[in-house]
């Protein structure tokens, strides 16, 4: 009897287990070993406080606080070798007035020592005049030439600001370099920006150069306007390059710029020289000098922009090399006199007309009173005639 009851219980238990399998889906069950999640080191350990034992370590720690934009920092002092109070005062002065990044970024810094030189702490307080983002955006370059390349790219991109840390710094007129680059590359840069430039510190082998650029138009608008300028410059290049000799190419360029456009004389110096000349018909000596330079370079003619005065007023013109001889060319003079053909001018002729410029900075021109004039350029073909443009104002 007992044996029969045991058998019945065993059967019931077996059925119960198999019944469970009808509603518990084995494919939804998984067993994985438990892994203890480690806590990141940054959550278990506080950032280690800098420890200083001598002047060099103290200086490095203070400069590190500045570079990391730390407004309030703690330094631990242990068995300090030297006069920590005197060193601290000198280092703070250096960090805020002589160190390039400190001179650029810090308005004021102070520190307080508690304890002793054997076991103490220094609390450093820094007031920044630059944001952490501004410090982080500083670009380090090896010398002035590398700095100028960065500046040129910023101008091409129409950037509004650039901060450079220049090693092996040499005294340079960066504002003049910027202006020259803009004038020499009207195909890349539409406007000569207003420039704000500051150097930090005032003296030193390594300096911070902070530049800000202000433009007359938005970046998108300037790109559209530059496209219009390049359309006309490309047409001029195609026309000028039909000339076979230096003389012919120079004469064709003169004819393109003086005969194919209707100009009004502009009194104010333009901030967008090529656009004002080619797209709006505003004639200024700066505009002519810039466009002539760019077109001469494109046509393989040696050319320079000359800055000086005429009748005591600022004036710009060009120096061209024609078949190995140098001559001055002033297209503004041609427009004012309604001259359709190119006139090659010597230094003597310019001085007779009250031009003044640093003559020794440029190659000498022939001493002959009547320099050879270029021949009449060959009339353009029908293909080059199609490049004609009007300089009437655009909408």
Across the structure, where does each feature detected by a protein language model lie?
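Sec-dependent N-terminal signal peptides of Gram-positive bacterial secreted proteins and lipoproteins
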Residues: 2-24
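Hydrophobic/aromatic-rich core segments of domains that either
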Residues: 287-352
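Periplasmic OmpA-like peptidoglycan-binding domain that tethers envelope proteins to the cell wall
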Residues: 276-286
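Secondary-structure boundary elements
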Residues: 217-278
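N-terminal accessory/pre-domain segments preceding catalytic cores
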Residues: 19-243, 355-395
